[in-house]
């Protein structure tokens, strides 16, 4: 069985994370990770290019060693900053009976990219909401259907400021890897929700170091997404000021004794901290600490509620899903549940090695990559049962179950080309299976050329 790897990079404000994974039945098997803490990122953006580049390079190396994979190509997640979310439609026509395949789907989606009229932005994700075959046949996946006249798509679109996109890609590719594609967290978050949550209307709250990102899904699709410049760093600042100690000490205390729900915090758990303006050590209880934490986390949630109100939402029937590094704090779920009547849960990836909320974005980037590979029908994987990995698998939505792998597809096509140059086969009569395989190879080669040229075209357009 050939190996098909996906590599995702999550450039966060406090650390850079890399995950190497593979599609395994209905889930993802993580085979290697890397994480490097850095000061080169601020508010989700590159603040110091050299420091950020070194952190990215280090985490790629760690993931490569852990997985045994020579990482050459990656999928990059992008934050919800300078981002626009809107709906668009496009249609392509046929002049004879045509069996729809991945190339037709790619063509109708690419046409939406060309319609972007938001100044200084680049469309990074176009995700289909529904397809319509021959004007009146609405389907979720048109592949293998026969169209006589047309294929239309109604899609959601995510666009981001070009400067943000190009600087992130430039920094990653300066580490000696190629960015195959990028996925916004706004789209990625759909893969941490259950189908029921997405249908009823659910709000994802990702509390990171500098940013809290909010995405709302309803009727199975992304409605909108925003970011709030208030997050874990603000919690630590409040602790440092309230306890009259240094930021580093406040950060350690937060992780060791922090509790976001005052009513559940302990007044028996005692710790001491150094003071900034003296040599004195002052003792505090977890309840004292919780007083500062709860106020700030409440403020973050109130900001989230403001975002939802701006969207005209008064009810979140599918509930709230909290994730990100600051979701590790005890009491976060209890505090939010005390503030709302809807269901609240903390999302933590269940794969071995990444069972922390801060890995949600990186692993869901792989889910996004797999979903688009299936949609565009890039490559077919023959699965084999292997019970040894069952504990490391997280179930993904059945809607996004796939048999494709973008990363290895590029690797396979490259190897095939090299082999063809060395030992071309003599002409022979093709069987039906041969013709099918040949057609598939041509489609894959065409797709590869489009993918490889995407960001080169972007680079060129920035200077026109």
Swiss-Prot record:
Signal peptide: none annotated. The keyword Membrane applies. Its main location: membrane. Transmembrane segments: none annotated. It comes from the Bacteria. It holds the Pfam family SHS2_FTSA. Residues 392-464 are annotated as: Disordered. Keywords: Cell cycle, Cell division, Cell membrane, Membrane. GO terms for cellular component: cell division site; cytoplasmic side of plasma membrane. One of its GO terms (biological process) is FtsZ-dependent cytokinesis. It is found in: Cell membrane. It is a peripheral membrane protein. Residues 416-455 have a biased composition (Basic and acidic residues). InterPro entries: ATPase_NBD, Cell_div_FtsA, FtsA/MreB, SHS2_FtsA. Self-interacts. Interacts with FtsZ. Belongs to the FtsA/MreB family. HAMAP family: FtsA. Cell division protein that is involved in the assembly of the Z ring. May serve as a membrane anchor for the Z ring. NCBIfam families: ftsA (TIGR01174). This is Cell division protein FtsA. It comes from Staphylococcus epidermidis (strain ATCC 12228 / FDA PCI 1200).
